């Protein structure tokens, strides 16, 4: 429950930031200082790019969690290269990002009671089970919420 609460909290914080920000600032790519947990290759993004990345990650994590809940480790290794955003993404990403948040929460609810011991390796954290991937979602949102704040502090 605390992992899901973390997701809801970070999602709400990102939504509040978006609501309080002029849309023209959200598409500006800004080079930010290195943040803990953020790859150097992710430091020159816009807010829209950050939301696109979160959307891609939520979709990928959802697929991994559903597979693990079925007792099957996904065959393809998780890769940070696979979750890079489009450089040309715009405000049209806002709704797909929100849907991805809804979808990952639905996946979490559907897989929470799994007894599967299947694991899939995260590129940084190693093999994780369903619960480990669940825990990662809120932490990941928090890293990128701080990224959004850093981007907007420089626009």
Language-model regions, residue ranges each:
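Aromatic-glycine hotspot motif
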Residues: 1-155
């Amino acid at each position: 429950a605390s992992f899901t609460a973390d997701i809801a909290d970070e999602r709400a914080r990102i939504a509040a930031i978006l609501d309080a920000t002029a849309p023209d600032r959200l598409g500006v790519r800004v080079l930010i200082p290195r943040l803990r947990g953020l790859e150097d290759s992710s430091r020159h993004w816009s807010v829209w790019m950050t939301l696109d990345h979160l959307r891609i990650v939520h979709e990928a994590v959802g697929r991994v969690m559903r597979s693990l809940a079925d007792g099957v480790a996904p065959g393809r290794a998780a890769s940070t290269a696979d979750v890079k955003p489009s450089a040309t993404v715009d405000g049209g990403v806002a709704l797909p990002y929100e849907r991805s948040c809804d979808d990952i929460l639905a996946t979490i609810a559907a897989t929470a009671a799994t007894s599967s011991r299947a694991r899939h390796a995260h590129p940084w954290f190693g093999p994780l089970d369903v619960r480990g991937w669940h825990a990662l979602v809120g932490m990941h949102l928090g890293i990128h919420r701080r990224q959004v704040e850093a981007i907007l502090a420089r626009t």
